């Protein structure tokens, strides 16, 4: 089965078969990252523009590495060093970039829906590297790849996602992807950070407290508080948040013995995650980062029309 999409905007747009194809391709391409010479000519002659309107370490760096390992030319643009600071609109930026004939634009933007707007106005492929509180599809894919590598499947897994669900694009992509693949997602967080009706997104259960969500979980995914997306203070204090929604060894003990701990980063140690848990043997956080390169290689490969990798 080929990949039928020009763009990758949201995991809610992808079928189970398409998600499986991307994960299988990432698994195949991950071997390249273990070589002494980590480069193949697959996308030679292609140009990838990384257009980031928000700060990023892991996502931007891994998209750049992914492009270069496939031999594409990668160009990085940040809003602070572009004509955006001079008042240029997204539409004008897109038209000017398109005039330079890129093959793919990878964009992160603070406004939800910005990528759909962009994709309708450019002929090249668009990949969403995060838009507001909407979605972060590459993070969702790398999270699923990490889980699948550990458990050999996604169907039937109990995945607990804890924290600021309302403002988290990662939570939405994980929910869309995991429920499509047959996992059961359990959510817990402060009532002020839990969207009304989120159960309608799929096989999702909202729990009254964190311990209920973590109990017998295969995966415990911790999210940081998205202070930059909150218009007002939604918590009495960080200390109180950590008391009720921070993952420590005691709470982790409620999960299955072979459970893994995940976090999309950056971690706020001592708030949502104790250092002793972040650095424990059950932590898969650095595996997530490693898998991010392979997943983004797969995304670039398939929007360029690549066939399934054997």
From Swiss-Prot:
Q: Name one GO biological process term.
A: 'de novo' UMP biosynthetic process
Record's protein name: Aspartate carbamoyltransferase catalytic subunit
- Role this protein plays: Catalyzes the condensation of carbamoyl phosphate and aspartate to form carbamoyl aspartate and inorganic phosphate, the committed step in the de novo pyrimidine nucleotide biosynthesis pathway.
Q: Where does L-aspartate bind?
A: 86, 169, 224
Q: Which residues bind carbamoyl phosphate?
A: 58-59, 108, 136, 139, 265-266
Concerning Gene3D superfamilies, the annotation shows: Aspartate/ornithine carbamoyltransferase
Transferase found in the keyword field? yes
Give EC number(s), comma-separated: 2.1.3.2
Record flagged with keyword Coiled coil: no
UniProt keyword annotations, A-Z: Pyrimidine biosynthesis, Transferase
Query: For this UniProt entry, what's an example GO CC term?
Result: cytosol
**Which organism is this protein's natural source?**
Citrifermentans bemidjiense (strain ATCC BAA-1014 / DSM 16622 / JCM 12645 / Bem) (Geobacter bemidjiensis)
**Top-level division of the source organism's lineage:** Bacteria
Per the UniProt entry, the disulfide pairs are: none
Question: To which pathway does this protein belong?
Answer: Pyrimidine metabolism; UMP biosynthesis via de novo pathway; (S)-dihydroorotate from bicarbonate: step 2/3
Describe the protein's quaternary organization and the partners it interacts with. Answer: Heterododecamer (2C3:3R2) of six catalytic PyrB chains organized as two trimers (C3), and six regulatory PyrI chains organized as three dimers (R2).
Catalytic activity, reaction form: carbamoyl phosphate + L-aspartate = N-carbamoyl-L-aspartate + phosphate + H(+)
Q: Which InterPro entries match?
A: Asp/Orn_carbamoyltranf_P-bd, Asp/Orn_carbamoylTrfase, Asp/Orn_carbamoylTrfase_sf, Asp_carbamoyltransf, Asp_carbamoyltransf_Asp/Orn-bd
Q: Which of the seven top EC classes does this enzyme belong to?
A: transferase
Family assignment? Answer: Belongs to the aspartate/ornithine carbamoyltransferase superfamily. ATCase family.
| Molecular-function GO term, any one | aspartate carbamoyltransferase activity
